Structures are given as structure tokens and as C-alpha cells.
């Protein structure tokens, strides 16, 4: 089933080279746009140990010509049906198409027993993502997500700090992420872009799935959501381009998420407060820990001064070596299938992000706090209403 080859394996210290026999996962890529081309080049160049590019599905002739010129011996498929007909030539499918096609393509190839690796978001409706997850479980195939931002050293360090309990009991998190500035030229670049009928949403479905994934990765899904969502605030369209979200947890933890595509210069700053101090992640590249000398609980027990402050010290954390986050995700996917290594992000993570996104939209449309997850029927009816409104415009 899998081709074999020898390749160099480096130890963690990268001081020794060890040859060993390794299987290769044969991957077929669907979608040869900007990210699809990037992924294809990485795999073809051997940047992903354990993975080989077996085929690419591309519908336009210019892309097909480029594929044949730059990727010799890689099969080019004109459409998904032609690719499915050659199912014996690949083991897994990487889906890098517009997100509205992720679910039907995933179902098509899962039914053939092919492992799936999907770009974000997994799908539009959480109910549809659940259906794909169920199909993958039925067929015994892997379902991975390309949530590459989890592999950035800063976010990995933040996750390790949270998991270790270094912040104590968590109280609050505030994430301001408005570094997504998009000019009208971007929104006009394709007829389907920034529309309810084409993309089924705007800012929260296009730009923010990575950060919603990391929110639930760090803190879990909230119990309730309230979204103050603005539609076409900075642009002449009907979808969302600015949002202020409140996440509520039964534990008492509270979160705020602020994002927009029409503000510049923007920032990407996450601050998390716990009983033992504050963690700051700046631009996804630097991490600071402002550590209390005593936790707020301990200080409250021993302090006798009326306006006392807790002594604290700010330090920057040393981060691990920066590696290509996409290569890490792809190699992990291959190792999961070939060796049983746990996935960095699987279909359940794609489902959680879809559930959170659906809840945010429903809250924004109805201007009320909603429980997570919401009923799929409510979300889908709300989406259809906005699509119909857009079509009448």
C-alpha cells in the first residue's frame, strides 16, 4: 500500500544521521490555488518526511500546465471524479479548496477509505462537520485539520504554560486580533468572496477559524456566547467585518475576543489572567509572563494593608526553535497514519471550531446570548435568510 524509501533522520540534537527504512504516505491534493501550490511545493521538495505527492486535482488548464512543468511524475487530475477513479494511486487526500466544498469532497473520499487532511474551516455548518466526522469513524480513516498556528513556538509555549497550571486558576482572557486589514480590492478579487452566498460569512468564517481553534484549544468551548457583530461596517457588503465577543464559562472564567478587517494598524495580542499572574502573547511571536510573588488567593490571606499591591515580575519566555508549521502538521499527519502518533488537531477540533463559529453568528444575527452548541436548524435558517436577502440586493 505504501511506497518505501530510505531517508535521513536527524536526532533532536541534529548531531547524528541515522538511516532507517520508512514508509511513505501517498497524498493527493485537491485545490491548486495559492495555499495548494505552497503545500504541493513543500511535499514535492521533500520537506515533509514520510509523505509523497502522488497527485493533484486542478480544474483550470493554466494550473494543469504548471503542474506538469514543475511536478514531473505527479499525476494531474482534471476533477474530483477522475481522481476518485484512480483511488488505488493514493492513500490520503489533502483538501485545500474553498471551504464550502470541504464536506462534499471529504465525504466522497472518506467513502473510498481515504484519510483526510482539511484546511480551515472544516465546513460551514457544525452538523455537516459532524456528518463527515461520523463517516470517517465509520470507515476507519483519519480526519486531520491544518490548524498550523498551533505549531508556532509562541502559542505552543502559551499552551504549555496553561497546561502546567503556571497561571493558577484562570480568571479572564482578552484577545484583540484586528491585524486582518483587507482593502476593497481584496473583497472584489472573486465574486464569491465576502458574501453569504459564496462564503457563507465574512470575518469569523474566513479570517478567524485559526484563532477560534486556538481559543478552544487553550480554554475549551465556552458555555455561552454573546457576539456584538457588525455587518459591512467598513465595506459595501452584508457579511461581518467587525466583532466584539463575550465568552462565558460556568466555571466563572470569562473571555473577550475583538476582531475586524477594516482597522489599521492592527494588533494580535492575547492576555490571560490567573491567580498566579498574567500571560501575554504578542503577535504570535513573543510570550511574556508577569508572575505574582504570591497568588491572589495566598496574598489575600496574609495581607493586612488596605491598598496593598501584589509584587510581581515580568519576564519574556525563551521559545523553542522556529520550524515550518505546515511541515510539522503534514509530518504529524503522516506519522499518525504510519505509526499511530496522535494528531495535533483532528476532526473533533474542526467540529468544535464550527460549533463556536455557528454560535457566534447566531448570537450576532439575533443580538442575544446563546448556549454552545446551538441547534443546527436555527443556525442554518439564519444563514439561508441572509443568503436570500443578499440575492434580493
Language-model features: where?
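Beta-loop-alpha module in the N-terminal Rossmann-like domain of NAD(P)-dependent dehydrogenases
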Residues: 71-135
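C-terminal capping/lid region of NAD(P)-dependent oxidoreductase domains
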Residues: 22, 141, 168-172, 362-382, ...
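N-terminal Rossmann-like dinucleotide-binding module
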Residues: 10-71
Amino acid at each position: 500500500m505504501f511506497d518505501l524509501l530510505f531517508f535521513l533522520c536527524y536526532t533532536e540534537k541534529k548531531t547524528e544521521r541515522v538511516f532507517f527504512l520508512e514508509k511513505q504516505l501517498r497524498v493527493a491534493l485537491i485545490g491548486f490555488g495559492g495555499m495548494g501550490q505552497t503545500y504541493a511545493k513543500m511535499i514535492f521538495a521533500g520537506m515533509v518526511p514520510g509523505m509523497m505527492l502522488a497527485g493533484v486535482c486542478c480544474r483550470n488548464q493554466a494550473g494543469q500546465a504548471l503542474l506538469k512543468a514543475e511536478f514531473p511524475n505527479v499525476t494531474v487530475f482534471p476533477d474530483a471524479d477522475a481522481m476518485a477513479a484512480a483511488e488505488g494511486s493514493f492513500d490520503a487526500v489533502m483538501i485545500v479548496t474553498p471551504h464550502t466544498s470541504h464536506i462534499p469532497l471529504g465525504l466522497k473520499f472518506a467513502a473510498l477509505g481515504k484519510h483526510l487532511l482539511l484546511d480551515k474551516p472544516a465546513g460551514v455548518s457544525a452538523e455537516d462537520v459532524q456528518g463527515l466526522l461520523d463517516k470517517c469513524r465509520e470507515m476507519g480513516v483519519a480526519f486531520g485539520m491544518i490548524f498550523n498556528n498551533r505549531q508556532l513556538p509562541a502559542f505552543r509555549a502559551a499552551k504549555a504554560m496553561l497546561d502546567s497550571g503556571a497561571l493558577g486558576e484562570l480568571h479572564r482572557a482578552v484577545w484583540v486580533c484586528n491585524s486582518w486589514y483587507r482593502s476593497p480590492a481584496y473583497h472584489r478579487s472573486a465574486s464569491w468572496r465576502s458574501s453569504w452566498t459564496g462564503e457563507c460569512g465574512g470575518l469569523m468564517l474566513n479570517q478567524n477559524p485559526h484563532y477560534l481553534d486556538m481559543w478552544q484549544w487553550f480554554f475549551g468551548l465556552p458555555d455561552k456566547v454573546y457576539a456584538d457583530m457588525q455587518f459591512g461596517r467598513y465595506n459595501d457588503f452584508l457579511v461581518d467585518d467587525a466583532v466584539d465577543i463575550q465568552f462565558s464559562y460556568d466555571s466563572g472564567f470569562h473571555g473577550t475576543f475583538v476582531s475586524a478587517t477594516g482597522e489599521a494598524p492592527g494588533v494580535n495580542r492575547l492576555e490571560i489572567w490567573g491567580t498566579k499572574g498574567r500571560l501575554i502573547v504578542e503577535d504570535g511571536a513573543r510570550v511574556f509572563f508577569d508572575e505574582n510573588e504570591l497568588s491572589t488567593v495566598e496574598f489575600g490571606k496574609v495581607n493586612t494593608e488596605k491598598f496593598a499591591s501584589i509584587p510581581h515580575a515580568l519576564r519574556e519566555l525563551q521559545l523553542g526553535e522556529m520550524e515550518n508549521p505546515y511541515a510539522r502538521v503534514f509530518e504529524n499527519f503522516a506519522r499518525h497514519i504510519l505509526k499511530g502518533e496522535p494528531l495535533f488537531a483532528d476532526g473533533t477540533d474542526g467540529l468544535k471550531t464550527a460549533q463556536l463559529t455557528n454560535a457566534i453568528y447566531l448570537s450576532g444575527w439575533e443580538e442575544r446570548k446563546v448556549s454552545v452548541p446551538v441547534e443546527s436548524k436555527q443556525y442554518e435558517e439564519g444563514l439561508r435568510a441572509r443568503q436570500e436577502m443578499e440575492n434580493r440586493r
